[in-house]
C-alpha cells in the first residue's frame, strides 16, 4: 500500500543528479527500486481502479505507465543518461504518446505536478474542439463550469495562438481554450510536502475524477475524428 514517497526517494534522485553515470546507477540499483520505483508503482496501482472507471480502455500496468529512468539523449545537448525525476501517464492502451490524451503525475526533488491534457500539439483535435465551441459555446462552457476548476486549484495551461481570430460567438470565458495550441489542465502550485503523505492518492484521485468530463469530451472528439472500425 502506498504510504507516500520516502525521504530517500528524493535523496536518491538528488544523488543521481550529481552522479549521473552508469557506475553509480548500477551500484545503487537496488536502492533505486526500493526508494523510487516501488513507491511509484504502488501509487499507480492505487489509482488504477478509478482510472478504469474513467475509461475502461486506460492502460494501468505500472511498467507501461511510468517514465523510463534512462533518458533518450540522441537529440539532446544534455547527454546525462538518467532522469532526476519520474512521471507516470494514464492513457489508452496501445496509443502512441505523441498527441495522445492522458492523465499525468510528476514528482522529483524540484517538482510536483499532476493533471490531464494532450501530449504536445494536436492541431487536428484542437481544430475540432474549436469547431464544437463555435457550434455550441454554451454547452462547452457549462461543462467546464461543472468541473469547478478553481475550487480544485486546477488551471488550463499550454501555449496559445496569440494572433488567432476569435469569433464573436465565443464568450470571454472560452477564449483561453479556443486559442490553445497545446492544452493541458494542471494543479496550481501543490504543496510539495503533500507527496510524502498517503493522502496524496486521494487528492490526485479527486482531481482526476473532477477532470473526467473534460477527458471524456475530448476523448469523444478524438474518436469521432478517427473512428475505429
Question: For each of these PLM feature ranges, what is it?
Answer:
Residues 74-134:
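Aromatic- and glycine-enriched beta-alpha-beta binding-site module
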Residues 33-78:
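Gly/Pro-rich turn-and-neighbor structural signature
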Residues 172-229:
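Charge-rich, low-complexity terminal tails
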Amino acid at each position: 500500500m502506498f504510504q507516500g514517497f520516502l525521504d530517500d526517494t528524493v535523496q536518491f534522485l538528488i544523488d543521481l543528479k550529481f552522479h549521473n553515470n552508469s557506475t553509480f546507477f548500477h551500484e545503487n540499483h537496488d536502492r533505486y527500486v526500493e526508494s523510487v520505483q516501488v513507491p511509484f508503482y504502488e501509487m499507480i496501482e492505487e489509482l488504477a481502479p478509478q482510472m478504469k472507471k474513467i475509461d475502461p480502455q486506460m492502460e494501468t500496468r505500472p511498467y507501461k505507465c511510468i517514465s523510463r529512468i534512462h533518458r533518450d539523449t540522441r537529440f539532446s545537448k544534455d547527454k546525462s543518461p538518467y532522469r532526476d525525476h519520474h512521471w507516470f501517464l494514464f492513457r489508452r492502451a496501445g496509443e502512441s504518446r505523441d498527441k495522445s490524451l492522458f492523465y499525468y503525475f510528476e514528482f522529483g526533488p524540484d517538482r510536483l505536478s499532476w493533471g490531464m491534457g494532450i501530449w504536445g500539439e494536436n492541431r487536428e483535435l484542437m481544430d475540432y474542439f474549436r469547431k464544437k465551441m463555435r457550434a455550441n459555446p454554451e454547452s462547452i462552457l457549462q461543462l467546464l463550469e461543472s468541473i469547478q476548476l478553481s475550487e480544485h486549484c486546477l488551471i488550463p495551461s499550454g501555449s496559445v495562438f496569440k494572433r488567432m481570430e476569435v469569433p464573436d460567438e465565443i464568450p470571454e470565458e472560452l477564449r483561453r481554450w479556443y486559442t490553445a495550441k497545446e492544452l493541458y489542465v494542471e494543479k496550481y502550485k501543490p504543496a510539495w510536502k503533500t507527496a510524502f503523505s498517503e493522502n496524496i492518492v486521494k487528492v490526485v484521485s479527486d482531481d482526476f475524477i473532477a477532470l473526467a468530463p473534460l477527458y471524456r469530451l475530448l476523448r469523444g472528439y478524438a474518436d469521432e475524428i478517427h473512428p475505429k472500425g
